[in-house]
Amino acid sequence: MKQSYAMDNPIVFFLLESNYFPMFSIFFNLLLLLVMFGSCVYKKRLGWENSDAFTNERFKDMSLTYNKLVVICCETLSALNSVLLLLSCFNLHKNGWDRSELMILLDLLFTALSWGAISFYIRSQFTYSHDQKFPILLRVWWVLYFMFSCYRLLVDIALYKKQELVSVHLLLSDVLAVSVGLFLCYSCLQKQGQGERINLLLEEPLLNGAESSAATSVQLDKAEDDEVVTPFSNAGFLSHVSFSWMSPLIVLGNEKIIDSEDVPQVDNSDRAEKLFWIFRSKLEWDDGERRITTYKLIKALFFSVWRDILLSTLFAFVYTVSCYVAPYLMDTFVQYLNGQRQYSNQGVVLVTTFFVAKLVECQARRNWYFRLQKAGIGMRSVLVSMIYEKGLTLPCYSKQGHTSGEIINLMTVDAERISAFSWYMHDPWILVLQISLALLILYRSLGLGSIAAFAATFLVMLGNIPLAKLEEKFQGNLMESKDNRMKKTSEALLNMRILKLQGWEMKFLHKILDLRGIEAGWLKKFVYNSAAISSVLWAAPSFVSATAFGACMLLKIPLESGKIIAALATFRILQTPIYKLPDTISMIVQTKVSLDRIATFLCLDDLQQDGMERLPSGSSKMDVEVSNGAFSWDDSSPIPTLKDIRFKIPHGMNIAICGTVGSGKSSLLSSILGEVPKISGNLKVCGRKAYIAQSPWIQSGKVEENILFGKPMQREWYQRVLEACSLNKDLEVFPFRDQTVIGERGINLSGGQKQRIQIARALYQDADIYLFDDPFSAVDAHTGSHLFKEVLLGLLRNKTVIYVTHQLEFLPEADLILVMKDGRITQAGKYNEILESGTDFMELVGAHTDALAAVDSYEKGSASAQSTTSKESKVSNDEEKQEEDLPSPKGQLVQEEEREKGKVGFTVYQKYMKLAYGGALVPIILVVQILFQVLNIGSNYWMAWVTPVSKDVKPLVSGSTLILVYVFLATASSFCILVRAMLSAMTGFKIATELFNQMHFRIFRASMSFFDATPIGRILNRASTDQSAVDLRLPSQFSNLAIAAVNILGIIGVMGQVAWQVLIVFIPVIAACTWYRQYYISAARELARLSGISRSPLVQHFSETLSGITTIRSFDQEPRFRTDIMRLNDCYSRLRFHAISAMEWLCFRLDLLSTVAFALSLVILVSVPEGVINPSFAGLAVTYALNLNSLQATLIWTLCDLENKMISVERMLQYIDIPSEPSLVIESTRPEKSWPCRGEITICNLQVRYGPHLPMVLRGLTCTFRGGLKTGIVGRTGCGKSTLIQTLFRIVEPAAGEIRIDGINILTIGLHDLRSRLSIIPQEPTMFEGTVRSNLDPLEEYADDQIWEALDKCQLGDEIRKKELKLDSPVSENGQNWSVGQRQLVCLGRVLLKRSKVLILDEATASVDTATDTLIQETLRQHFSGCTVITIAHRISSVIDSDMVLLLDQGLIEEHDSPARLLEDKSSSFSKLVAEYTASSDSRFKRSSMKTN
């Protein structure tokens, strides 16, 4: 009967008839021989007869094992078939001949000839190189040969069982052919060559021509000079689908620790710049409005990466369809096992169909995920580029509403989240497709019961709508609170030095912790809501199946085990997208929030483009022309910042701007730069501009890079600039001269050095117009005079120069002076003209004259007032010489980011787990998950056991009992899921909170040397990206790991219970999977680490750009900075791309192994004699096995991804382990509350360096500052003045020596006790975002009356009273809505409130005019008369009335005495310094000043 059925079915007969195999084999072998013969003839005609020697020589030099093994395999197969041919001839000669056996002999003959010809062809014609693959036709032949050999082996096994095989040698030949074919397939998928350099050519056809070879040679030569691009861009089809192009990098990762240089660049089509311009071209604007909506953002993102999205759509569709092949055939499979066979060899056909479907599913899923992640990388790249581009065009007044921390958050968190959404992009429509396919299969199995299944599914999805809305609300609030925290964190880190000097760091830490508390509140709601959604959807399959089976019972639809198992298989496949639904909903919500936030940011107004008319150099006689100009930082303010501005500046003029603090001087320069919005009037600027900001902006990088600022090196001009800016002497002190790396914001430079470097930067640009904003305030008098003479009057004598200054001695040389007051130009003219024409300038000159008179009086006065020189001030020449001879280690201050190597240690996991209740919940979570799996399997076993196999078998239990037991088991398993989800959420939340608190506490307790050596971007990276991973990603990854591991164990248990032989299959497969994981993880781990590290430069560059945007725009350097961000973007993208490619390389191989294991398990099941196993249980086992490859790949993928994500924990733990400063409070040595009462400071042999690898800055200071006296510290820029002050506050710990205040060694008391008892006005005035009140009294210790009193004393009272909100008037980030001088006065107000016994002024009045300086000095004399005041100043008038003067030179005390005594000695350095200062005020200034008197 079976034979007749086969004859009636021609397809089955055709497949099973062995005589057709030799015929097909002969045909294809003949075809191959003809093609190869044609190839040889064609090449011979082209003159390739003499190529044998060349190719053979190349072959001898081959170092690639694959190539040699391929030739050996071909030769072996040829020899084997020849031997088999002889043996078969001998056997047939002995036993007799027939037609079918003759066909086998011909097949062996032509097979031997084909393999011999291939071997000869490869040796003689195919040129091996490190870039080529085997010809495409040859590789296709090998793949077909492998498939043909596999099927032939199956048929010969069947014939052997029937004892119809001609010879057992043929069976052995088939086994060898399959093995060799598998190796050849693997070889043809490999890139040929070590190093895996980019293949610039399309794959060569089998017929190579001379022209193509010549082109190959030329292109390969060119490739040597090109950038190494990812092999993906030129990989062949089979290499693409198998990810074999990643193999060389994986191999390299096992041979060495991969560095960034080992990873190739992304393809040109995936570069940030190309994607960015595509994105920009697709981003449409509304008519008349540059408004970006979320829809337009999505549309532009789609068109940026449309190719990958469409390909992933195709693969997702193929995957979804292939998933449902097995459930569709499951009922047939169970019936087959029950003995109901429709045709002979039905089992082989079923197994083959299952196997092919799983192969297609495996291939489609891997390419689907890969393409989606590739698209995600591209989307992140364009979003980062777009946010950066917006930052380049954002005006200062817009940025005040969006701090740097918020903008960086958009880049680090929101852009990354949108990138991560690529995983879930297709899930919504796939879910619809899967439900549709599932309903078709269910209708086939359950009839009308499928409608109930659909209704239950719809009900589950409907029930998630309110939870999804809650999730969207929680997510939006979570991101908003994260922004607020990051804003405060960024501000605190940027100003950490002032926080530590004032003893405020713990107060700011508590503010950040409070903000984190708000964020944690929303995070807690978010994770628990997600846990609830997860519980509902994990319980959904059981609910849907119970509903469907219950409906069948009510509708009297008979339930057979085959149909039940088919339905369960469908539910299990449908379970995956339903399980993913909570994550999908969550990601959709999070992505929408992020898209809305980015769209809102991109909708901010750009810098006003029509406010200034830009003219090319030399096109106008006037370089700057303003007529009836009105400008305002806030265009909504009724009172403009600047009004009635009129002036014309011809080329080559020297313009000075002066005025009191807050009069609008800096705003006027900003208006010329186009930074202040124009309200009315006209502004024309002709030529290129260069700008020197009042607060120096220095990039992290080498000194040379800061000066060149993107221009090519012109050595002669470069040296002239260094000389004019007095930088040569500083460079000699730097460990690597101009190659020394400057820390972020120039943190390892003095204020004067930063100022001179940015002046050098401006000079080197050779611009037409130079704008200097108070450039001489941060340098000493001698250096200031030198800069004015060499720069403004020297190199720039033929340039247009506009400079703001408070040093009026630089005014007489100006061609035009503009005097400003209250935002108006009140006077304009030459020095002598305006001196006689108004009172505003007279007030400034009068104050300066008084200061000069005070200096003169000290020069001419006697030394009777204070002439005693302390013995402590004497430092012997021998000691100085001895200190100078001490070797000082030299090295860069800024260190490379820490990078762990090797696998993530077990201690990292241990520490992570113990952060939540000592790890007590982890075993409970595992037990609950195991219990869920047991109950879930039990419920399915129950259905398979009690339902009959066919209609003629009586059910074991009644329908109601069947459903009730199933519902009970399903409910119990659902409850376990709820418990597991809640416990996981609780654990993850606790760990995230503990990690955050510990890391931030250690960061804020770290010494300043940590912040000096660590760019802020690195810290922010951990506080944002790594913290987000710990908050949300890691808990779900650990849950997924537990779920996958327990599920796999359950599947193995189910299959092993049905047929124990299956366990034999799993042992080698699991071993192979484990080996692959170990082989993969070495490269993947380093790629993940490099990817994490590469984010920090991106964040750092972004942060630096935002802080220096005015300087960047003034130099027209936006294109260069845009190029830099694109380069950094590509650096991150290439590392991330190869990291996800490595993951897919692994997953493809694991899926392949799982598919083979699945197929072998099916072979075992169909091979077991009928009646040995229960068909229902066997079908159930297959149902579970359908998810085996998915679960196994998920397990390994989760393990690998978990290790990659644990790098975030590893990076945070690095900061938890950083050394802390000494204790804030030492109870045993706490000083009295009245300490210090006298304020006497004694310094003994003080030696200071900024790090063990850096040279000494202070080299053995010994002196005493008498209590109640005022001491001025002077010296050339970089001599160690500010370092001495930092040591006094223990910002820098002494390397040797000691400091005593009122007899107490400051090294023995707590830092808080020390710093809170001292007061300082720092060199760089700092204000924090908040209000006037919070800036003056951040600790909330004083009443409003006291604050107003302090404001009046520091000359800000009237200014604050004019503001509507008074003390609650807003202060923007870094006090950007206040002038630098006003910020300095606020710092003065702080110390007036604090009233400490010891006050340090570190260039406190550098940014104010002379009149304000005089008022400040009078205020200090009046309110700190009994205090010890130490003043560092470049203005001699600020220290000339001091009781003592300390002069430092190169870290040593040169002089220490009273000013009068030092001035008596005309040879003293101080006397010379005073003489230089007074001489810098021109005699014209003095004469003109006297006229006014």
Swiss-Prot record:
CDD domains assigned to the protein according to its UniProt record, in alphabetical order: ABC_6TM_ABCC_D1 (cd18579), ABC_6TM_ABCC_D2 (cd18580), ABCC_MRP_domain1 (cd03250), ABCC_MRP_domain2 (cd03244)
Subcellular location: Membrane
UniProt-annotated stretches for the region Disordered: 863-898
First-listed, main subcellular location of the protein, grouped into a coarse class: membrane
Keywords: ATP-binding, Membrane, Nucleotide-binding, Phosphoprotein, Repeat, Translocase, Transmembrane, Transmembrane helix, Transport
Claim: Membrane is one of the keywords in the record: yes
Amino acids binding ATP 2: G1275, R1276, T1277, G1278, C1279, G1280, K1281, S1282
Domain ABC transporter: 624-847, 1241-1475
Bilayer-spanning residue ranges: 21-41, 70-90, 102-122, 140-160, 165-185, 309-329, 343-360, 423-443, 448-468, 535-555, 915-935, 959-979, 1038-1055, 1059-1081, 1153-1173, 1177-1197
GO cellular component terms listed in the entry, alphabetical order: membrane; plant-type vacuole
Residues at which ATP 1 binds: G659, T660, V661, G662, S663, G664, K665, S666
Reaction it catalyzes: ATP + H2O + xenobioticSide 1 = ADP + phosphate + xenobioticSide 2
Keyword Transmembrane: yes
Reported induction: By salicylic acid (SA).
Membrane topology: Multi-pass membrane protein
Residue ranges of every copy of the ABC transmembrane type-1 domain listed in the record: 309-590, 922-1204
Entry's Gene Ontology BP terms: response to other organism
Tissues with expression: Ubiquitous.
GO MF entry, a single one: ATP hydrolysis activity
Family statement: Belongs to the ABC transporter superfamily. ABCC family. Conjugate transporter (TC 3.A.1.208) subfamily.
Function: Pump for glutathione S-conjugates.
Name of this protein: ABC transporter C family member 7
Organism whose genome encodes this protein: Arabidopsis thaliana
